[in-house]
Amino acid sequence: MSNGFKILTGHPYGILSSLSICFGPKKKKVNIAIETEGSYRKKNFLLLQRPAEYNKLFKFFSPNDLGINLNIGHLNLASRAFNFSKEKFVKMLKPYIVALELSHNNGFEDQHLPLQKGKWYWSIINDPYFAEAYKILEFR
């Protein structure tokens, strides 16, 4: 994260209207970050869960135009639901990621549990590339 991004996170439910504001806020120094989504049981109801969706999005927005809040819990759910590699997904989003939203889950429900020792996400959290990225703890 070397672009000095300030962050405003949000869910992409209103993706079309939300993305349209990305062109105006630069004048007011407002930067936009979209939170990655993910659900196992309701996977057909959410946008921006699969790599192909981000490939389409990135045709219109550069890392200077739009940031990504990578929700680790949602990534666990989406990768299970749609059978894709978490590591490849993070690599694809890496230039856009300005924040990591951190919680643990069982891969079926978004439980917002505290992080656990030795789990898959630590290599992402400890990646030097994300040293300056915001870390958001989402525990219940």
Region locations from a protein language model:
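Active-site acidic/histidine proton-transfer and metal-coordination neighborhood
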Residues: 1-67, 77
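Gly/Pro-rich active-site loop or hairpin
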Residues: 5-6, 44-52, 74-136, 140
